[in-house]
Each structure stands twice: as structure tokens, then as C-alpha cells.
Amino acid sequence: MVPENRRKQLAIFVVVTYLLTFYCVYSATKTSVSFLQVTLKLNEGFNLMVLSIFILLNSTLLWQLLTKLLFGELRLIEHEHIFERLPFTIINTLFMSSLFHERYFFTVAFFGLLLLYLKVFHWILKDRLEALLQSINDSTTMKTLIFSRFSFNLVLLAVVDYQIITRCISSIYTNQKSDIESTSLYLIQVMEFTMLLIDLLNLFLQTCLNFWEFYRSQQSLSNENNHIVHGDPTDENTVESDQSQPVLNDDDDDDDDDRQFTGLEGKFMYEKAIDVFTRFLKTALHLSMLIPFRMPMMLLKDVVWDILALYQSGTSLWKIWRNNKQLDDTLVTVTVEQLQNSANDDNICIICMDELIHSPNQQTWKNKNKKPKRLPCGHILHLSCLKNWMERSQTCPICRLPVFDEKGNVVQTTFTSNSDITTQTTVTDSTGIATDQQGFANEVDLLPTRTTSPDIRIVPTQNIDTLAMRTRSTSTPSPTWYTFPLHKTGDNSVGSSRSAYEFLITNSDEKENGIPVKLTIENHEVNSLHGDGGEQIAKKIVIPDKFIQHI
């Protein structure tokens, strides 16, 4: 909102400008004997300055009125974008206007103001696409999007740009032989307004892409609603409220996956392709105007800028396509067994919040984009979700470790699952009973953890099973696993049911001395209330007291 004092100042300025303009026209008319003499007096000195201010004021008021009619109230972000781009556009327009003779002053001023105002309208319309997408809710339909104010403004601006281009081209053919300099003027205007038309083409393609995504989501929602059926009650005592509960058909979980629409896959890559296409059209237009028609060398900066932007957009599009192909070919597809043995026990994709595997018996995927893929750091995500994430960021969405190296290749994995680390040795305890060490390794699931606190405390009285459960729920899996060789001690007596193993814990670079750790396994006989005897196994890790400190 404009402050009250600013409104008063604007009103005074408008009144003074109109009074001065009326005075200049009246004085020039009273002191002249012909219309030609009136125009000559108005084009010099103080009269010219007043008329210029009058034209700028009225064009600004007209622009404000048209903005109010076409777009309504402008948002704060739209005002910011206008003021960010406006200074450079004004300077560029002034430089282009200085290329022509002063006798074309009013023609250049007219086309300059018209071009400036239409550029502002195009900026606002581009921002309105984002506002339109953000306003979509459950009651929005495709019909309301197509017949919205945004679509009307898009068609209106396209028609205006086309009409201006055709008028300029007709003027070129009319003045081609009589006035060559005016031909260059109209050629530049044709080029500038064609650039605006290409921007509208870009916006139109982006709009079609977003509308298609909305249509797909509506179709997916409709199919999901059609999939819900009402069960027929078979019991006479069934409560009426229970009869109205919808029952889902017991179909294959892959069909449910296909019905769920989580966004248009590769949308970011399609947007990049549209930008590359329109940038190529702009570059070709600048080159076609610069070389054959010998346009001013000031256009060379636009050609260089377009070529650089085209190169950057093309390189970005190629990198996105190459990375998406590597994600599918290089990353490992996780099976049900690997997922069950991994540290990712929640079976949830962190991006779409959907299950990675819906059924324990699922071995294949009808929708290949829903295959769970393991990143080099060990985290598991859907392939489609991973592609959408990698289009904007080259790091893992959970731990932020890089997925691609400096050469653009997938980094070498440092993750090793629990199922890959097994021990085939057989240990005989003090009672003479052989124990399968591999089965023990499956019971004690030691998970690698990462902590963000520099104060790492070792709690010697903590139970191993409780510690493992807490590690799964609160810690993030580390990208590196370390194995420690176990050595059975010989201090176990014959009548004891205790087995002990000693090993050393060291850091990754092994520059410091290791910490001796002892793992003890005790078997206890437990008598239940019914008289049944059982055996309980207690596992405990013992660390000397002198090593219990901040590491």
C-alpha cells in the first residue's frame, strides 16, 4: 500500500503536470499562425520537457490501470522481480534508442515505452504461473485452470506481440526503398517483440507441462477412488456404521504402486529441455538479424550472452541425463532379504514417505521406477524419488554425502551390510557344547553408528540388545564398517557356562593405541512358574575403567 503522504504528493504532481501541459499547448497555439508552427514550438525548449513528462506520467498511469485490470494486486515477490530487472532493461533501451537519428525520437520513444511495459507484463505473468500452481487444492479442476485469468493473459499478450510484429513488418515493406534508416528501426523492434513471443512460448510449454502433471494426478486420484469398493455385510448383527466402511480390494501391491502418483518423473529435465529449445531460438534470431542485415554491433553482446546461456543450459541438461542413467545402471537394486538385513528397518523412502517394499514376497516391480536403490552411503530410496532429488542436489538427502565424484561418476560404495559379514568358525564353550558362531553373529546385530556430538561416552552397564535397538531408532548409519578380530580367552573353567572373547577397538587410521574390550556370554538356567526349565543368554561388553572417558 502507498502511504497517505505519498498519495498526496503524487496527486499534486499530476495536477501540476496537467496544468503546465495545458499552458504550453495554449501559449504555442496563441503565438502561432499554423499547425506546423505549433508543432515546432512544442518540440523545443521548456515545452518539450513538459510534454515528455506528460507522456511519461500518462503512460505510467495507463500501465498501472492495465496491471490492475489484468493481474489485480501484485504480490511482494512480483514487485521485487520488477525492480530487480527494470534498471538493466531501461539502460539497454536507452542505448538502443541512441543508435537512431533524432527525427525518429517520438517513434523510438513510443516503441521503447511499449516494449518496456510489455516486458513488465511478461515478468508478472511468469511469476503468476507459480502462484497458480500454489493455489491448486482439492476443489481445483482442469477446467478452472484452463479458463483462469492466467490463461487469458497468456493468450492476450501473445496476440498483442503478434500484432505488433506484423505491423512492424508491414512498415518495413512500405519504407524499404524510401527510408532505409527507418527499416533498421523496425527490424530491431521486430527482433525485440519476437523475443517476447519466444518467452511466451517458453511459458506456454511450461504451463502445458504443469497442467499435464495436474491431469495425471487427477487421473491417479480417480483410479484410486474407483478401486475402493464397499463390502457387503453378511452378519445380521453387523453395526450399520461398520457397513459403510470402505474395503480395499486385495490386489497386487504393484497395482497400488501404479495408481499412486507422486509427481511427474523427469519434470526438471523437461523444463531444462524447454529452456534449451527457447534459448536456441533466441540465439538463432539474433544471428539471423546481426549477419545478413548488418545490424548495429551493440547486438553482439546479446548474441554472446545467448550463446553462453545456451551452452550452460545444454551442459546442465546433458549432466542430468547422464546422472539419471548412472543411477539406474550403477546403483544396486535392493532385494527383500537385503532390506531386512540392512540398518534401514523402517522400510520407508524418506522422499515420498512410501514403503520401499510392500510385500515380503515381492521380487519384481511392474513400475521399474519404484525399485529401491542403495546409495554409496548405504541409504535406500526409490529410483524415481532419487532421480527427482538428484536433479536439484548431488548429495544424499539423509546424510548429505556426495553421490557423484568430480568426474561425474558415482562414487565407490563404502557400505557393507550385516548379511555380508558372517563368521563360519565353530567355538566350543566350557561345557563342551559346540556353538555355531554364524548363528551368534545373527543374534547380536552390531550396527555402525554416527554421532554428531564430540563427547562419546561408553556405558559399561548397558545391555547389548537395548543398545542395538536404540542405535536403530536414533542413529544414522555410517558409510564405513569396521570389523574387529575376536580372540577367545583361556580363563574359562570346565564347569562354567561363560565364554569370553577379547578384541581391540581402534580408530580408522590406527594412529592411536587400541582399547582392549572383552565380550562375555553367560548361560543362566531360568525356572518358570509352571516348572519348565529354560536357558537365558546374557551378553555383556566389559571395558576397563581407565578407558571410560571423553574420546
From Swiss-Prot:
Transmembrane segment boundaries: 9-30, 44-71, 85-101, 104-126, 148-169, 184-208, 272-292, 297-314
Catalysed conversion reaction: S-ubiquitinyl-[E2 ubiquitin-conjugating enzyme]-L-cysteine + [acceptor protein]-L-lysine = [E2 ubiquitin-conjugating enzyme]-L-cysteine + N(6)-ubiquitinyl-[acceptor protein]-L-lysine
Result of altering C399S: Stabilizes HRD1. Reduced interaction with substrate. Formation of oligomer with or without USA1
Matching InterPro entries: HRD1_E3_ubiq-ligases, Znf_RING, Znf_RING/FYVE/PHD
Chain spans, region Interaction with USA1: 517-551
Gene Ontology CC: endoplasmic reticulum; endoplasmic reticulum membrane; Hrd1p ubiquitin ligase complex; Hrd1p ubiquitin ligase ERAD-L complex; Hrd1p ubiquitin ligase ERAD-M complex
Pathway: Protein modification; protein ubiquitination
Cytoplasmic-side segments: 1-8, 72-84, 127-147, 209-271, 315-551
Chain intervals annotated as zinc finger (RING-type): 349-400
Stated role: E3 ubiquitin-protein ligase which accepts ubiquitin specifically from endoplasmic reticulum-associated UBC1 and UBC7 E2 ligases, and transfers it to substrates promoting their degradation. Mediates the degradation of endoplasmic reticulum proteins (ERQC), also called ER-associated degradation (ERAD). Component of the HRD1 ubiquitin ligase complex, which is part of the ERAD-L and ERAD-M pathways responsible for the rapid degradation of soluble lumenal and membrane proteins with misfolded lumenal domains (ERAD-L), or ER-membrane proteins with misfolded transmembrane domains (ERAD-M).
Region (Disordered): 226-256
Additional detail: Present with 2660 molecules/cell in log phase SD medium.
Protein name, UniProt field: ERAD-associated E3 ubiquitin-protein ligase HRD1
